[in-house]
Regions:
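Basic, amphipathic "hinge/linker" alpha-helix immediately C-terminal to the N-terminal HTH DNA-binding motif
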Residues: 63-86
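Alpha-helical DNA-recognition elements
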Residues: 45, 49
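N-terminal helix-turn-helix DNA-binding core of bacterial DNA-binding proteins
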Residues: 2-44, 61
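Amphipathic alpha-helical dimerization/coiled-coil segments
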Residues: 80-110
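Short beta-strand "wing" residues that participate in macromolecule-binding interfaces
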Residues: 58
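Glycine-centered, phosphate/nucleic-acid-interacting loop/turn motifs that mediate DNA/RNA or nucleotide
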Residues: 54
Length: 110
């Protein structure tokens, strides 16, 4: 798959996961890796950017048998941004799907 396709939606995927529940970085990386072919280390720059943009906040949580983990949570702005970006992405994806279908139908008629 073209890396540019993935790059454009990874932030939305991170926001989507964090809308469901707070997660620590490795957990986010593992979840995305199960569904999308991403390189190691892809998620942490995204998390830093989203936090710098005010979309995420972090907190430390003690874990039994190990050091505390840094958890990520959506801020109010993060939830609002997710809703807006999700709607825009779905509209865009629908438009692309329509264009591809029209092209396919035109080619079938030839």
């Amino acid at each position: 798959m073209n890396p540019q396709y993935k790059k454009g939606v990874l932030e939305l995927c991170v926001l989507s996961l964090l809308k469901k529940r707070n997660c620590y970085g490795y957990e986010i990386s593992e979840y995305l890796s199960e569904h999308i072919d991403i390189a190691d280390g892809t998620v942490y720059p995204i998390l830093r950017k989203l936090k710098a943009d005010g979309l995420l906040t972090t907190y430390l949580q003690e874990e039994s048998g190990g050091p505390p983990r840094k958890y990520y949570a959506l801020t109010k702005l993060g939830r609002e941004t997710y809703q807006t970006d999700r709607a825009e992405y779905l509209k865009f994806a629908q438009t692309v799907q329509t264009l591809l279908k029209e092209e396919e139908e035109a080619n079938d008629k030839k």
